Amino acid sequence: MSGMDTKEKRIRRKMPESLLLVGIVLFFSLLALFLQGIPALAAIPEEWKRGISTILLPVLLLVILYGMVTGKISERRMVFLIVCLTMLFHCSYCVLSGLYERQHDLGVYTGIGDEQVNPGHLGYIEFIYKFRKLPKINPYELFSYYHPPLHYLISGLWVIFLTGCGMAEELAFENLQVLTLLYSGLFLIVCLKILKQLGASGKGLYSALLLCALHPSLMFLSGSVNNDMLCTLLIACCIWACLAWIRKKTLPRLLALALAIGLGMLSKVNTAVIAFPVGLTFLLDFAGVLFESRQTGKQAVWKELRNYLLFGLVSGVVGLAWIVRNLVLFSELPGVPTPANDSVMSVRAYSLWARLGIPALADWNFSFPFHGISSEYCHNNWVIMFRTSLFAEEFPAGIPAVPLILCQAAYILAILFGTAAAVLFLALQLKKALAARKETAGGQKGALLRSPLFQESCFLGTGYLAFLLGFAVFTIKYPYTCSSDFRYIVVCLLYTGIGMAESSRLLKGRISARAAGVIRAGVCAATVLASVSVWVIVIWRWW
């Protein structure tokens, strides 16, 4: 055993974990680029690619499950295997799914040979590629142009680079998926950093990573060409940076948080939701500093104010640049163009309770758990959220009995254990807040407000609730079935994973620890079953 430990330490000295994991992500991203961008490799029969993936994925998964159950694989190797599984899963999906499959508001591109300006995410990217500049038109005149430009600027430059290297235009646009594949891998690494920061290890860590590794929603986003995956990555960076600042309140960490929020808003405006829990954390800390200043003097107060001013300057200049630009040039406030009121997606005819209340049993429609765009088929926000989280907007009419049973089982397990995991997460944050209160009892006034444990629990708990509440408000403001898509709050998977990871560390009672273990096992089972179901209905489609 000591020999293995020594070997492990040597490997760790030779290759830091973060560098190794980033290398894995880059390897699979380049693999997807070559398989889609080099004509000879792109011509390999799809059956071969599908077959190889279908052999390797279960093997990797079984090794990981063996390590989770027996504990005979070291943590470093387990993390390595989970990242490999994630990237193989996402890379296979990108390679086996075309540019026009399962996209949202994709639009079209007509190529550099004409002067046509096209709508949709592809049109936005093509504009930058074709005209070598950002659009100077009113962003609400063409669909999808209202989005902030960061993702589209990166994508446009990527197409320019690939075509400049000699790649055919069609293949270059197909390889837009490589960027979102890269983002999905980096998202998992940031999730790992957050979980390690919170003290996660062992089965709790593995179950949380497995949720983010195999959850179908992240697989779908890894092959998308819109801005959702980059936005999700940057929100995760905000969470990571804020937790780092809570532990050590330095100006560089505060500015890193400001930059993450600013870039997130420059990717998608709904990143602003993270500002609410961040603002609460700042408020708690500043109130604690004010209490302390009665004994230590006002110097700390002025230092805090200076730091917050710099934070606001960096995050505001970067994050609000697009909003201010549209307001000055076109007198346009942020918003989303909506379909017509008589659209089949409109849910205006239904009451708020029918849309946002607890769904009736009939609303769940367990017999066919897929999302139909018509509000007559389904109009409850939470039902649509669960369906799109597993199967996106797939509607496989004529699906045979066996795949359908797999999907039904995954759907039921996801509802039961997903809800239980959400409750577990919130309960753990409350437990941490009460523990912080107990630790600081009898201390100086304001000690609780500056307690890292208390700030952490408030930041995470209110952050999760802010995303759920923001999601509900969004569906009220834009009352269409498409507004209830889980992709808008896919970062909630990270919060769920945090709850799963922390449960193995914080719950020591016999009953509570067993209950948490059942929830972790149930979430992992639902995730694995959902990924298998999606692979069957999306990739194989033998019927």
Residues covered by each model-derived region:
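Membrane-interface anchor segments at the N-terminal boundary of transmembrane helices
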Residues: 40-56, 170-184, 370-465, 493
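Perimembrane helix-loop-helix junctions
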Residues: 241-247, 274-316, 340
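Extracytosolic helix-loop segments that constitute the early lumenal/periplasmic catalytic or substrate-binding loops
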Residues: 91, 95-143, 150, 160-162, ...
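Membrane-interface transmembrane helices that cradle and orient dolichyl/undecaprenyl
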Residues: 196-199, 238-253, 264, 286-289
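Start-transfer (signal-anchor) and selected internal transmembrane alpha helices
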Residues: 1-96, 286-287, 300-314, 442-458, ...
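Transmembrane-helix signature of polytopic, membrane-embedded enzymes
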Residues: 167-171, 191-214, 232
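Membrane-lumen/periplasm interface segments of specific transmembrane helices
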Residues: 304-418
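Transmembrane-helix motifs of polytopic, lipid-linked glycan transferases
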Residues: 65-67, 174-199, 237
